[in-house]
Regions:
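Conserved redox-active cysteine motifs that mediate thiol-disulfide chemistry
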Residues: 65-82
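Solvent-exposed loop/turn segments at secondary-structure junctions
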Residues: 67-72, 97-101, 123-124, 152-153
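Conserved segment of the thioredoxin-like fold in thiol-based oxidoreductases
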Residues: 85, 90-121
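Thiol/disulfide oxidoreductase modules built on the thioredoxin-like
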Residues: 109-113, 120-167
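A short beta-strand-turn-helix
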Residues: 40-61
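Hydrophobic beta-strand anchors of alpha/beta hydrolase catalytic cores
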Residues: 62-63, 91, 136
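Short pre-active-site segment immediately N-terminal to redox-active cysteine/selenocysteine motifs
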Residues: 59-61, 66-69, 132
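N-terminal targeting signals for export/organelle localization
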Residues: 1-44, 156-161, 165, 171
Length: 171
């Protein structure tokens, strides 16, 4: 009986998070876009089924530009997983400089990512986001970039604070 009680107490204090789940390569149908925007940078969805014109994306949305090979990008994934778990703001990833699309898919599955990912096949996003990663942009409902985070987002608290401040989304 004593063991059961101790085990129950122990299990109560173990944090259960989505970080251990398997990711899913999802389609881009959930990305809010202004369909009247017909010109701009067209990026394929990592699932290979659709393309999205970057300039047509509308928010509130957090755009995270990353590469699976990038150590700081890997460090910030848990913070995006925490944000996604709140279901309050959209996240869209842009995978850059991968050897191929399958490498990006493998990364998504391994890291537990479940938000739409666009795939930059030829470094076309460098002209928009710059050459380094990670880069995170916060885009409002009108499609305006209201904040740019260059470099790693170091904590979930910082990410949530930026969403609150720049996208006016209460978390």
């Amino acid at each position: 009986m004593k063991r059961i009680l101790l085990l129950s107490l122990f299990l109560t204090f173990i944090p259960f998070t989505s970080h251990a789940t398997t990711g899913l390569v999802v389609g881009c149908f959930g990305i809010k876009v202004d369909k009247t925007v017909s010109k701009g940078l067209s990026l394929p969805c990592l699932d290979g089924k659709a393309k999205v014109i970057y300039q047509g994306i509308r928010g509130p949305v957090v755009i995270n530009v990353f590469g699976s090979w990038c150590a700081p990008c890997n460090q910030e994934i848990p913070h995006f997983l925490d944000l996604q778990a709140l279901h309050k703001v959209s996240i869209v990833g842009i995978d850059v400089e991968e050897t191929n699309m399958q490498a990006g898919r493998n990364f998504v599955i391994k890291k537990g990512i479940t938000w739409p990912i666009l795939y930059d096949t030829n470094n076309a996003t460098r002209g928009i986001f710059g050459p380094g990663v990670p880069v995170t942009w916060f885009i409002n409902a009108q499609g305006k970039v209201v904040y740019k985070q260059i470099g790693v987002i170091a904590s979930t608290l910082k990410l949530k604070s930026e969403v609150n401040k720049y996208l006016k989304v209460k978390l």
